[in-house]
């Protein structure tokens, strides 16, 4: 419950931390004597309490809770929740064998998604190019190349590879995404901003027609206004908030939504989103800034939005 302790843990300590965290979550959900306490903890967090204070308010004596957890861990039986299959709606599941090129490119795709440093990006794109040269007609291979090129900073090459992928498969989601990423990065330096961003949003608009509930087109439709220092349309703002509903785990997206809500003086909604950021144990500087803004929102009657935005962006 203490983010400060979390930050000082070793790698071994982190393993123990996550294990104990899941044990605590499981116990609070199924313990009759602790019924409702997890909801109370979440409520205290939403009121602006830090994790420790919220925990003390909800759980009481930490020593007693820890002893109960130790006993729960040693118990031979754990309570579970059964969900009958009739209560689930399962869509069609299709499985196929990877094509040869896809299999060869799988390591590149995994490393791209996991993230690489600048040196690793240059190494990865060389490998991706060699594979892509052997499988020029495989759209998945070309879209994976596009991703590697973008990560390496090669926007023009990423766009070319995306186009090759889309020429073979006009429903390749990753190809649209990588093309959009590259065009948006190019647009930052374009002399004709209006034309550049109109071109940049096109792949995301095309993706939106294929996947209406994909969050990235909704997010980038908002970004194009902000990047040009224009006031976002109501449709763009609503789309941004819908994107957060679709991807609530995305801290960067939540931050963007909170900024927009502060600009619009919708402080109640901004508080909800900032609360989720403020006490995130992984939050770093953003968590500290969010806590400061929350204090201002709750302690002052006439808050200047520009001052709050400045705090968050510092």
Language model features with spans:
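Active-site-proximal alpha-helical
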Residues: 1-52, 206
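TPR/TPR-like alpha-solenoid helical repeat scaffolds
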Residues: 180-181, 218-227, 259-263, 285-305
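TPR/TPR-like (Sel1-like) alpha-helical repeat modules
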Residues: 196-205, 262, 267-285
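Canonical positions in the second alpha-helix
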Residues: 131, 164-165, 206-207, 242-243, ...
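Short coil turns that delineate tetratricopeptide repeat
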Residues: 136, 170, 212-213, 248, ...
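TPR alpha-solenoid repeat register
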Residues: 141, 175, 216-218, 253, ...
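Beta/coil-rich, acidic/histidine-enriched accessory regions frequently appended to metallopeptidases
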Residues: 47-188, 269-272, 290-314
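Alpha-helical adaptor scaffolds
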Residues: 113, 147, 177-189, 193, ...
